[in-house]
Amino acid sequence: LKSMKIAPGINRYFAAEKWNCVPSDVWKEQREIAKANEKRDCDFRAEGYDIDELALEVAKKNAKLAGVADRITFAKRDIKDFELNDGFMTVITNPPYGERLLDVKSAEELYKVMGEKFKRTQGKSYTIITPDDDFEKIFGRKADKRRKLYNGTLKCQLYMYFK
């Protein structure tokens, strides 16, 4: 969405649209401005992988709702089969973890595999969301940048690797 300058939530309804203090034409006008600023002709392509078929179906549905389904290739694939491609690459992942889908030991094994697969290479960046405070130690290197965030009600860290 960011590459194509598609505004988040452009196709959804907001409860604030019923507020009397904001004229309804303001919402319409801002949506028109946002749509006029979209860059549908950009060279954006993406790939989405998961080992869970249901997760892939949800991702496909969301991509369609966002209007980017034709630019994303989805496939069932394990992280163990991940390979770096040539050129620029950004990996963004929200892996399963102890509190969400996996037990702690399995999550730690996954982080180790990610550390082996996500090599420090020019033109490659990695962003990982997890609540695990020991992630960097298990992954094998310190993040270039960290941010606190919530994934729903779960306190997490956003670990960014780009150097």
Stretches found by the model and what they are:
Residues 44, 70, 87-89, 124:
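Short coil/turn segments at beta-strand junctions that form active-site/ligand-binding loops
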Residues 1-82, 99-100, 106:
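Conserved S-adenosyl-L-methionine
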Residues 41-45, 49, 53-57, 101-163:
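Conserved Class I SAM-dependent methyltransferase catalytic core
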Residues 80-91:
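A short acidic, Gly/Pro-enriched loop at the edge of an enzyme's catalytic core
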Residues 66, 85, 120-121:
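Alpha-helix C-cap/termination motif
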